[in-house]
A protein has these predicted regions:
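Hydrophobic h-region of N-terminal signal peptides that target proteins for export
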Residues: 11-20
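Accessory carbohydrate-binding/adhesion or oligomerization-edge regions at the termini
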Residues: 21-78, 162-171
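Accessory beta-strand-rich segments of carbohydrate-active enzymes
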Residues: 26, 48-49, 90-201, 223, ...
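N-terminal carbohydrate-binding accessory modules
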Residues: 27-34, 204-205, 277-347, 366
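Surface beta-strand/loop "capping" patches
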Residues: 195-224
Length: 367
């Protein structure tokens, strides 16, 4: 019995060590906010104008602050075509939040990611400016490398964000805020920390054709000399159906190019998805970092004076215009609400969506 217990403890310890090692090579994520409107996290908040202004209180993040009882509701259409009109709501929101990070993340590349903020924002972490000090544009993900200004373990980190509802860039205002919809302010999509090994895959661009031809450009950060990228294609059951190894060119990019056999093709009615696993290795084959990305094999063609073909079959688009919006939560949605919209669109026998007039939540695109 004692030998069995000892063996079990050794086996469990080995499994734990293996799991930790696997996690250390994968990209890891820690949310500082909620994932959406259904699980917001309270941050300290101060609004400079409108309702409930002039005092520090709490606000759920992510959210549009108007829907949380702050600032001024304003519809954009009355200001259409006017760069700097009188009467525009221009309050600011100041956010503060403290958090800790795992001690084992020390030495990794640490990125602070905002999915979207309306509209201008200035970010500091532990009293130091993040990035160039100002991000503009309300619908785009932006990322700061904060590896050199972050603490680990029990030492708390302090995040401060100042958000301006109106942009100081008139072109941003004309493009985003002088239109036929509500103008909101706030950190309205999730905020999270990403941890990667110091040598890592920064991003990947995939081009997978309907004939099984798979290509990808892997952009690398601080890749060592002789680095290579191993690519594995997994089917829906997790089985490896194809693999390849590509050398990094100029040490900061690897081009993947190989053929797969008889893949199941993606269409609007049969959206077969595969998973590409990209593994960055050093010259000796040691794994440095691993990324995963879902994709579908498909070929899209436009034939002049004819139409659009997907995988050689002509497609008649039956679509709808869709805003990222709910009257209860503004532009802050959730995975459930995004899936709800997709199911509604499919129930109307539609096969296309116009994402007016800005990038949608990643969860909507993935649905």
């Amino acid at each position: 019995m004692y030998l069995k217990q000892t063996f079990l403890m050794i086996a469990l310890g080995a499994m734990a060590m293996t799991a930790a090692a696997q996690a250390s090579i994968d990209t890891q994520r820690q949310y500082l906010s909620g994932h959406g409107c259904d699980d917001m996290v309270n941050w300290d908040f101060y609004c400079t104008g409108g309702r409930n202004a002039g005092k520090w209180t709490k606000i759920g993040v992510p959210s549009c602050w108007e829907l949380q009882g702050f600032g001024t509701y304003q519809y954009g259409m009355r200001f259409y075509g006017k760069a700097t009109p009188e009467g525009i709501a221009d309050e600011k929101g100041k956010y503060k939040y403290e958090f800790t990070l795992p001690q084992e993340w020390e030495g990794k590349q640490i990125e602070l990611v905002f999915e979207a903020v309306m509209t201008d924002d200035k970010v500091t972490i532990n009293g130091r400016k993040a990035g160039n000090g100002l991000h503009q544009g309300g619908f785009y993900r932006f990322t700061y490398d904060v590896s050199d200004r972050i603490f680990f373990g029990k030492h708390k980190n302090r995040l401060e964000v100042e958000v301006s509802k109106e942009s100081s860039n008139s072109q941003v205002n004309m493009a985003e805020r002088r239109a036929d919809y509500w103008n909101f302010g706030g950190i309205f999509r999730p905020v999270f920390i990403v941890a990667k090994p110091a040598e890592n895959i920064d991003r990947v661009a995939i081009d997978a054709k309907g004939d099984g031809h798979f290509m990808a450009d892997c952009y690398l950060n601080r890749a060592v000399k002789g680095a290579k990228v191993k690519t594995e294609i997994l089917d829906e059951k997790g089985k490896v159906v194809a693999s390849n190894v590509a050398d990094a060119r100029n040490s900061d990019e690897a081009h993947v190019d190989f053929q797969t056999k008889a893949p199941k093709l993606w269409t609007a009615e049969t959206p077969h998805l595969y998973t590409a696993v990209f593994t960055l290795q050093d010259a000796a084959g040691k794994t440095l970092h691993r990324e995963r990305q879902k994709f579908g094999f498909r070929t899209i063609e436009y034939r002049a004076s004819d139409g659009v073909y997907i995988n050689g079959q002509k497609v008649i688009f039956k679509g709808v215009n869709r805003h990222s919006f709910r009257p209860e939560t503004g532009r802050t949605l959730s995975k459930a609400k995004n899936i709800e919209d997709v199911k509604l669109i499919k129930s109307m026998n539609m096969n296309a969506v116009r994402l007016s007039h800005y990038p949608a939540d990643p969860e909507f695109l993935e649905a």
